[in-house]
């Protein structure tokens, strides 16, 4: 980002700031010519960013016939799109507005509030204010997207979006999302915490999927299936990935880790929960056998000199990125599965529900989960 100017308004008085960049630690310092009075203040920042090509921040797809843009902010790339407190433990409500070509569909975390009239081929889409979210969970996608049928679970509408021409391939994903959401609401004992649930298929994506609140992004090869041509393994992978991302709506989004050293708690829980959900929906798939196979892969990774603790000390953005691996996901899920078997399924579920209720719309650490399980 290029920060052009900044000012703070306190009690109706505006104070201009000097901007001091610290690229080595990816922070910025705003200096004022006098001490600001205690109390609420409004910080206004003028900035300019760029659309990237490396699947980070706000980036463009490679398909020049159907141009599109999307965001990928996890773990530490929100700061490449807009100035923010880019830490998981700091949450805010966001008012997102996007100006784009009038013919394009614009998607974000919240439902559309209004769209302006097209002027010179562009229009602005304004979204409703989000609930409290960490910056890395904000999502925007712009392009020639279309959706098919809508599923409804409780008050939550579910849609699958893909580039034009791929709409029939989202049928299985829509069914899997609805079946997962039904079971997750029952397990957590509370409804889905966001106003909608969009599943968005992107041809170019850094991960298999990303659990942005209310607008989950997927690599299209993971989300979209030709049911006549796909294998049982393909369907299992799609269902498991969807269940994993939807589990994050509660464990990760509604309650977020306070810092990246507890990333394992988010990812291992979603991994474990996805297997529980898919097994309950399709027991004939015997998905726990797949879990055993993945655990062996985690064992092999854990035996290397480069292994790390499940909960390592994270001090930099690079260290946060390095922990998205099988140790965090699968070894952590194995630990949680052992814990669930030790305390009992009912006690474990009760403890997690307590943890979610205590810390909803906030951040928590592993110790908070252990306290809820006592």
What are the functions of these language-model segments?
Residues 1-199, 221, 226, 324-326, ...:
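Acidic/His-enriched low-complexity segments
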Residues 3, 13, 24, 127, ...:
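Hydrophobic alpha-helical and helix-loop surface patches within well-folded domains
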């Amino acid at each position: 980002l290029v920060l052009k100017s900044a000012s703070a308004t306190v009690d109706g008085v505006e104070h201009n700031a000097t901007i001091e960049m610290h690229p080595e630690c990816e922070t910025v310092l705003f200096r004022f010519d006098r001490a600001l009075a205690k109390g609420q203040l409004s910080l206004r920042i003028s900035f300019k960013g760029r659309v990237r090509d490396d699947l980070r921040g706000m980036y463009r797809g490679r398909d020049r016939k159907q141009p599109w843009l999307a965001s990928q902010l996890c773990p530490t790339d929100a700061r490449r799109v807009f100035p923010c407190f880019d830490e998981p433990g700091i949450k805010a409500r966001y008012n997102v507005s996007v100006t784009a070509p009038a013919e394009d569909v614009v998607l974000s975390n919240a439902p559309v509030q209004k769209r302006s009239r097209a002027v010179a081929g562009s229009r602005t889409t304004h979204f409703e204010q989000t609930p409290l979210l960490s910056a890395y969970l904000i999502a925007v996608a712009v392009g020639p997207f279309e959706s098919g049928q809508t599923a409804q679970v409780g008050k939550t509408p579910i849609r699958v979006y893909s580039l034009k021409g791929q709409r029939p391939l989202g049928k299985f994903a829509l069914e899997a999302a609805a079946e997962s959401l039904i079971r997750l609401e029952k397990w957590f004992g509370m409804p889905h915490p966001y106003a909608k649930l969009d599943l968005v298929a992107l041809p170019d994506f850094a991960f298999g999927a990303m659990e942005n609140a209310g607008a989950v992004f997927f690599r299209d090869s993971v989300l979209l299936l030709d049911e006549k041509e796909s294998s049982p393994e393909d369907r299992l992978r799609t269902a498991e990935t969807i269940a994993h991302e939807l589990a994050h709506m509660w464990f990760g989004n509604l309650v977020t880790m306070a810092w990246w050293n507890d990333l394992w708690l988010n990812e291992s829980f979603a991994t474990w929960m996805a297997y529980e959900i898919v097994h309950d929906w399709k027991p004939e798939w015997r998905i726990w056998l797949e879990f055993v196979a993945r655990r062996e892969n985690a064992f092999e990774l854990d035996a290397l000199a480069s292994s790390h603790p499940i909960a390592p000390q994270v001090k930099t953005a690079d260290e946060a990125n390095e922990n998205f691996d099988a140790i965090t996901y699968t070894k952590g899920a194995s630990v949680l599965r052992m814990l669930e078997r030790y305390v009992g399924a009912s006690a474990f579920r009760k403890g997690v529900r307590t943890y979610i209720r205590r810390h909803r719309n906030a951040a928590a650490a592993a110790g908070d989960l252990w306290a809820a399980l006592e």
